[in-house]
Amino acid sequence: MKFGIISIFPEMFKAINDFGVTARAIKDSKVSISCFNPRDYTTDRHATVDDTSFGGGAGMVMKYQPLSAAIEDAKNTLGCGTKVVYLSPQGSIFNHRKAQELLQNDSLILLCGRYEGVDERLIQDYVDEEISVGDFVLSGGELPAMLVMDSLIRLLPEVLGNKESVVEDSFYDGLLDYPHYTKPAVLPNGNAVPDVLLSGNHKEIAKWRRKQKLIRTYERRKDLIECLCLSAKDKQILDDYKIDKVSTKGEE
């Protein structure tokens, strides 16, 4: 997969290039990243990429000309049909489903805004989709872009050493992940790993993990549960959990 990054701070993307799973994917030629700095496409000696906002107001707005030139160059490099995604608080929320949708593209151009944002006319002329990573505001689009890239890269075939790592992740099946434990089996304070995980009975372990995924999602993200078509067995697990929870409260 190919990424084109439009950013005035391309150095920030060394984190993607140099560390962890994403760095390994780049080294193995499963991913390529090209950065296009709008300052390189300016026409004045100060390399100006922003200006004041028409109508007044605080903050500066990123200019149309250098951004459009950077996007055009990115399209020439990655392909004229490459989808342009603008990382913006006004965009649709990024989630696992959106990640899978974006994976259908062989290449993506990620536009990272700064200041108060970009000239609206650039969005009208070049942006195919606006994506937000949450209902909060950051200083720029670079961190959201890296978040999106990391999420997509780890979903690519053969990027993770164990393909089960992707299948068992939170949100892959619409549920949160189950609890994980490692050695020692018992901590000095007596807190122990659930016995079933030490039993070696893979069928019972799978049942326990499914139950934990359902309960954890119900407790922390009921909105996800409401969007799923649960099996009769899954529904029974949750019904039993709710009954046990009420009974436990009644005994307190």
From Swiss-Prot:
Similarity remark: Belongs to the RNA methyltransferase TrmD family.
GO-annotated molecular function: tRNA (guanine(37)-N1)-methyltransferase activity
One Pfam family recorded for the sequence: tRNA_m1G_MT
Quaternary structure and interacting proteins, as annotated: Homodimer.
GO terms, biological process: tRNA N1-guanine methylation
GO cellular component: a single term: cytosol
HAMAP family assigned: TrmD
Reaction equation(s) it catalyzes: guanosine(37) in tRNA + S-adenosyl-L-methionine = N(1)-methylguanosine(37) in tRNA + S-adenosyl-L-homocysteine + H(+)
Binding site for S-adenosyl-L-methionine: G113, V133, G134, D135, F136, V137, L138
Subcellular location: Cytoplasm
Organism name: Francisella tularensis subsp. holarctica (strain LVS)
Top-rank EC class of the record's enzyme: transferase
Protein name: tRNA (guanine-N(1)-)-methyltransferase
Role noted for this protein: Specifically methylates guanosine-37 in various tRNAs.
